[in-house]
């Protein structure tokens, strides 16, 4: 995805909101260090800054009102987070957060899924995460596969914004959590192909596939 496409495309604010909430939670101090190294601690405190809090409120309002964000703004947020030493855990938490929110919107996930065949539960889990993936590929392609279970994305913001596979952990976690919520557990999910590593697509599959 080119810089021009990022500037023109619009995406849902939900991903940006989840990412900033995860960033904020990661930066809440668990203890006070008297001899704190400011240079070391400053990057970790970004999530507690007034700018981040203001953007959380803005993204939440946009989400409630059905608004959108420029894809460029979301891509720049991914770039910012990817430079943190704890980037992988922040992306992972955001992915789980998004899957949880998606399931709540559909209501009663666990109760509905309990009596359904495994294949139907798997399809429901994939449908939930594919919606998240499409928010991250406004000018790309997203598809899912049932046998073996898989999520394939081409031209998404994740790898292209981060220029690595760190941001792709967001969908890694979202897929894993979505399948758990629909009781279609496949175990750990692996990111077997990555555009950020030079592959043609980003592909996620169960580690045992």
Regions found by a protein language model. Name each.
Residues 138-195:
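Short, hydrophobic/π-rich interface segment
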Residues 188-208:
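Beta-rich nucleic-acid/ligand-interaction surfaces
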């Amino acid at each position: 995805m080119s810089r021009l496409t990022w500037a023109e495309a619009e995406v849902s604010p939900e991903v940006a909101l989840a990412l900033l909430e995860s960033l904020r939670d990661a930066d809440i101090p668990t203890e006070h260090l008297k001899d704190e190294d400011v240079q070391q601690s400053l990057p970790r405190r970004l999530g507690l800054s007034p700018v981040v809090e203001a953007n959380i409120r803005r993204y939440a309002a946009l989400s409630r009102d059905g608004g959108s964000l420029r894809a460029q703004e979301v891509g720049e947020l991914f770039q910012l987070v990817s430079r943190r030493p704890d980037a992988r855990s922040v992306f992972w938490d955001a992915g789980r957060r998004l899957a949880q929110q998606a399931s709540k919107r559909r209501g009663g996930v666990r109760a509905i899924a309990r009596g359904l065949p495994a294949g139907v539960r798997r399809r429901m889990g994939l449908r939930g995460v594919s919606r998240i993936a499409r928010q991250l590929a406004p000018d790309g392609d997203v598809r899912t596969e049932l046998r073996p279970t898989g999520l394939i994305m081409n031209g998404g913001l994740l790898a292209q914004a981060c220029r690595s596979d760190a941001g792709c952990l967001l969908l890694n976690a979202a897929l894993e959590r979505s399948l758990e919520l629909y009781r279609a557990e496949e175990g750990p999910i692996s990111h077997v192909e990555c555009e950020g590593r030079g592959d043609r697509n980003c592909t996620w599959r169960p580690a045992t596939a």
